[in-house]
Amino acid sequence: VTFARKGVLIMRGTATPFFVRGHTARGPWNLLESSLMGIDLLYVAQPAPAAAQSAAMRIIAEEALSASCDVWLLHRPEDHELLDGVIIPSRKTGFIHEGALPLHMRPLPADIRCKAIHLSQLASGSKNGLASGDLSVAEDSFQESEGNAYNCFARALDIHDDWEAIYISAMSFEAANRVANAYVSRLFGETSLPKEGRRDDRFLGAATPAGAVDFVPELTRGLKRYLIKGRAGSGKSTLLKRLAAEGLRRGYDVEVYHCGFDPNSIDMVIVRELGTAVFDSTAPHEYFPDRETDEIIDMYDLCIAPGTDELHADQLAPIQSGYASAMKEAIGHLAEAKRLRNAIEQPAAEAVNMQEIADAARDWAAELLRNGANGLRTAPDGMA
């Protein structure tokens, strides 16, 4: 993307949105670590209202984009319109909030220089918050709502296992292997690269208080797309795992997008060096070909015994209904958790001086953008 400045065309950076955390059927899940590979300077926002943290990140991202740098926008599963962080790969820098760090990365590795950012200091004055007793009740209710959501997701996973079992029993594994071999050959041919491939683990989408959210259109923009159709248990994730492993073996950088419901499953693989994306295109991230180069891989037609849907229709109906009910209930609990968190944070959020946040964010952006420019490594004041 280009824009004009004083008659000169300037290339604007590209923003890539995704999730690295998720509310999953296996509990809270964090995939941030791979996004920090190669990062040597990280600003970490200490506890502060989520909206204030996200506002600072948006400004930093915009400054980087205007400086022709690509950015990764890490969205929050608690509210997908807010950010967990922003990464500027070309500058080997990032700005995240402390809560996005997985526990095993606290403290950060020694090769990542860290600066603590205290947004709560940029306040215009104190606001009356919840009384201590009310605050304790709200915190307990928040924890209960999140816990209820995870219980519902776990119940949905048990139901989903029954759903998968029907199709696994009707599957031709020989046919699935033929499909995998065919698409390995089609995507990679005889090609390889003389380097070690990089694997980035992310989430394709996330269960949020607003429902299931994904960024498939943004992530696959400009790529040749293979849309995998099928059923639960029809081999979609297995095919994607095979393609990811093959890409890495051949030295390609591979983006591996995990299922936001079950992080042990894979929903999308992108190999940008080949201009290719292959993804599970079934609900809740169901898409249909809308680009001239889009192609469908139908695992049901290719690998499952004909008539399986019809043969098991009576068995499938209550499974599908029970799964949908559990997922809907889980989303309701997430929405309640968001409402409670907003109430808890509201007084502190109202006390934040957003103009000071904006001014400080531009300064932080300038520091982050200097790092890695022309090989320089910056060391801002206050480096921890």
Task: Tell what function each PLM region has.
Residues 41-61, 222-247, 384:
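Glycine-rich phosphate-binding P-loop
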Residues 12-24, 41, 62-126, 248-324:
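Conserved nucleotide-sensing/catalytic segment adjacent to the nucleotide-binding pocket
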Residues 1-10:
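Short, Lys/Arg-enriched N-terminal segments with co-localized hydrophobic residues
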Residues 27-28, 158, 297:
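A detector of single, family-specific signature residues
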Residues 134-190, 315-318, 322-367:
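An accessory alpha-helical subdomain
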